[in-house]
């Protein structure tokens, strides 16, 4: 018989840098999960993606065991990395902070494709371009 899921915890953690301090510790402590076990497993699974923020969905079962799924980094994080900026524009319609090429957008769309609600690569690119526009990043 399959184990019953008691709780699902969603977090965004820097790759390879999970530790028992907030926000990880309190979120998992309330669910009764072995925090150090999760941190070690997460860090081992994400060490090659250092510098990126990784969304993770942790399923906690009634016997306090857990499984987790790592997702692709959020589109704004990938766009900031591609554009080489620290943060997006405070006034995206007035102030443009950077420029990315169509090829960079295509690469990000291919990376995000599994998590996006898009039928094909072109639709995924349009989603990423919209995110870029809302951050004050120009697409050429």
From Swiss-Prot:
Protein family according to the UniProt entry: Belongs to the universal ribosomal protein uL11 family.
GO cellular component, one term: cytosolic large ribosomal subunit
InterPro entries xrefs: Ribosomal_uL11 (IPR000911), Ribosomal_uL11_bac-typ (IPR006519), Ribosomal_uL11_C (IPR020783), Ribosomal_uL11_C_sf (IPR036769), Ribosomal_uL11_N (IPR020784), Ribosomal_uL11_N_sf (IPR036796)
Protein name: Large ribosomal subunit protein uL11
SUPFAM superfamilies xrefs: Ribosomal L11/L12e N-terminal domain (SSF54747), Ribosomal protein L11, C-terminal domain (SSF46906)
Pfam families reported in the protein's UniProt record: Ribosomal_L11, Ribosomal_L11_N
SMART domains, per the entry: RL11
Coiled coil start-end: none
One GO term of the biological process aspect: translation
Organism per entry: Staphylococcus epidermidis (strain ATCC 35984 / DSM 28319 / BCRC 17069 / CCUG 31568 / BM 3577 / RP62A)
Keyword Cell division appears in the UniProt entry: no
Keyword set, alphabetical order: Methylation, Ribonucleoprotein, Ribosomal protein, RNA-binding, rRNA-binding
Role according to the record: Forms part of the ribosomal stalk which helps the ribosome interact with GTP-bound translation factors.
NCBIfam families: L11_bact
């Amino acid at each position: 018989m399959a184990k019953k899921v008691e709780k699902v915890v969603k977090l965004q953690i820097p790759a390879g840098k999970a530790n028992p301090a907030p926000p990880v510790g309190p979120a998992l402590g309330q669910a009764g999960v072995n925090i150090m076990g999760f941190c070690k497993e997460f860090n081992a699974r994400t060490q090659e993606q250092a510098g990126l923020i990784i969304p993770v969905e942790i399923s906690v079962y009634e016997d306090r065991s857990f499984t987790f799924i790592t997702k692709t980094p959020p589109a704004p994080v990938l766009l900031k990395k591609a554009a080489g900026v620290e943060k997006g524009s405070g006034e995206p319609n007035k102030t443009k902070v950077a420029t990315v090429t169509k090829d960079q957008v295509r690469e990000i769309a291919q990376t995000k494709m599994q998590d996006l609600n898009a039928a094909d690569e072109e639709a995924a690119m349009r989603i990423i371009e919209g995110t870029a526009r809302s951050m004050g990043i120009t697409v050429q």
